[in-house]
Amino acid sequence: MKKKGVCAYTQADVKMIRRFKDTDREIFIEMAEEFYNSPAVLHSIPISRHSDTFDEIIKGGCYLDGYMFEYEGQPAGFGVTAKTYSPEAGGIVIWVEDLYIRPQFRSKGLGRLLFEELERNGDPRLKRIRLEVEEGNIKAISLYKRLGFRHLPYGQMVKEL
């Protein structure tokens, strides 16, 4: 599937979502550090992981995508998604790994753009969008519910390697 360069413009180009470009490295790492040092995540991660993530996205594989949000020409946030196939869902599942909007750009409809883009221009076999959200992130939970998300009563377990 061919990836599109620019995804969506709205309101006379006031808000925009587009795929990462090579030149986004510095601003992505800066915003990823903001995100991973915020209450929206359980713990911070080494800065090298942001750089590795960016490299993996720019490499252009079929499993990881990066989206940059802009508002009035300013970097406003980012999204990172991962793609997998799920027998349970019966098709492709997009995991929203990271979704971060800088505080001064929140409640301007930017987060909604990512989900609209995934549904409109994503893989035609897409059956589910999945994400994690901290219980205390009330504004994000409210947005996700308005967009049709529901609580998935699975617990998750991980093993670090």
State the predicted function of each range.
Residues 66-68, 74-83:
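Conserved beta-strand in the GNAT
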Residues 122-132:
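Conserved GNAT acetyl-CoA-binding A-motif
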